[in-house]
Amino acid sequence: SLLKEDKPWFAYVDLDIADQAEENYIKSLAEIDQQIDDTLASVSLDNTIVIITAEHGTTFNKLDEKARENYFGRDEIQVPFIVYWKDLPVQEVTKLTSHTDLLPALMSSIFKVKNPVSDYAQGRNLFELNGDPWVLASNFRWNVIIQPDGTQYHIDRKGNYKKFDRTYTEQSSSRPPLGLFLDVFKQERSFVNK
């Protein structure tokens, strides 16, 4: 069988959970858990890296389409992020992370790449986080800096600015933290320029 042969094998399962009531969502999660279990039972974990994550979370807030597209509440941006490989020690990362942190983790910890992370990725190694003070999320309109305490700073291309606290309540703030935005965009631009 293809799955038991000693050849490289890759699988990508694109699961799309429709916008449903909470109880149907929970039922869908149980079905996904079973699909993951079935998939893992069909491959040899001796030479397999398993990564389980999601593009975004699910909010049950009543939002219209435009509000949903621009929503960065914790329920929407916090996702599962599980990495398994037989030679990785079991650990739980509780610091603020981003999907951009996966590639540096794989390249440094599994594939033993010695180049500086900045040569090939924007993120940080998940397994060697050193307390960086923010992650960046974005959509077609907003760039959002998220700090470990949950504070979010949103800015768009037209200079529109919003600040939210950890509960995603908009805060009164007339001046964006320009130094922080400049640091973030400088770091992002330095990677693109390479």
Feature names for model-found ranges:
Residues 2-9, 17-50, 64:
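A long, amphipathic alpha-helix that forms part
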Residues 3-7, 45, 73-77, 138, ...:
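Extracellular/periplasmic catalytic domains that process cell-envelope and extracellular macromolecules
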Residues 10-14, 52, 83, 135:
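Structural recognition of the beta-strand scaffold that forms the well-ordered cores
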Residues 16-18, 56-57:
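Catalytic metal-binding/acid-base residues of hydrolase active sites
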Residues 21-31, 73-74, 91-98:
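Extracytoplasmic/periplasmic, Sec-exported soluble proteins
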Residues 30, 34, 38, 79, ...:
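Feature representing long, continuous alpha-helical segments
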Residues 47, 53-88:
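Histidine-centered active-site microenvironments of extracellular/periplasmic hydrolases
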Residues 85-194:
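Membrane-interface soluble catalytic domains
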